[in-house]
């Protein structure tokens, strides 16, 4: 070893080394830079990243050796974590220089290491997982996670309706604000429809030079804005109670109607001939079947307990479900005629 060091210090050896370096064929191994940000060559960054990966693989294989004591295992595990951080620095520098992003869409070179990550992202490999205190650390972490999940579940288990906003409408202020906003938007949309129809009629009219001022549009030709086809707003609690009451009343009514019908015959099912083909037993002298007739003294019709219809579930009346009235052609023509009369009165009479 001493002889090799002496050779390296000789004048001829240093001359050959300088000559090889100038030609770009130096055989002396270069040391890896301490800072990845100091390298500005993408090719060099790729090279040093590969070098770090090879070193990580070598140390991960070495940490599996059962001949190592606990101190050596801890030192190797620390070195592996340092190399992993250094690999991340080189990957960030590669991305900064416009290279590939190795952190995205690339599987881990160490496999799935879930459950072996300590605090601060510190990882344990090989025999380091069996070190004293490491198993207890992972067991306590799992217990803490289970405890936090249970605590979160119990915290949100018995929340009052006010937490979800179900009691915001009880004071009536929110319903009043919503009703006012609905009326304003309803009026705006209605008059937009009216103005659109008026412009369509004016485009087909010969008098294209008629222009109405803002003051003339106030009357709107006697057209009134219809009310919103909906019942008066009520709090959510009252609406739910009304629906429950309507369902209960409909069910009781159906049940009473079913109980009031006469009792049917004791047989579970009437004969097929009596139910479907009564004309087979009634024939005239020529042998032709007599058409069935409805007798007043016939047995009462059978009624079954049918489920309530969809209308029984609704809290709206039939009038509430009617579409709002929309001005037709006659109403629009009346509006235009009144506006034209008003314009002529102001032009010739001044009133």
From Swiss-Prot:
Disulfide bonds: none annotated. Transmembrane segments: none annotated. Residues 202-214 have a biased composition (Basic and acidic residues). The keyword Nucleus applies. One of its GO terms (biological process) is mRNA 3'-splice site recognition. It is found in: Cytoplasm; Nucleus. Residues 202-241, 254-327 are annotated as: Disordered. GO terms for cellular component: catalytic step 2 spliceosome; cytoplasm; post-mRNA release spliceosomal complex; post-spliceosomal complex; Prp19 complex. The keyword Mitochondrion does not apply. Keywords: Cytoplasm, mRNA processing, mRNA splicing, Nucleus, Spliceosome. PANTHER family: PRE-MRNA-SPLICING FACTOR ISY1. Belongs to the ISY1 family. Involved in pre-mRNA splicing. Associated with the spliceosome. This is Pre-mRNA-splicing factor ISY1. The lineage of its organism: Eukaryota, Fungi, Dikarya, Basidiomycota, Ustilaginomycotina.
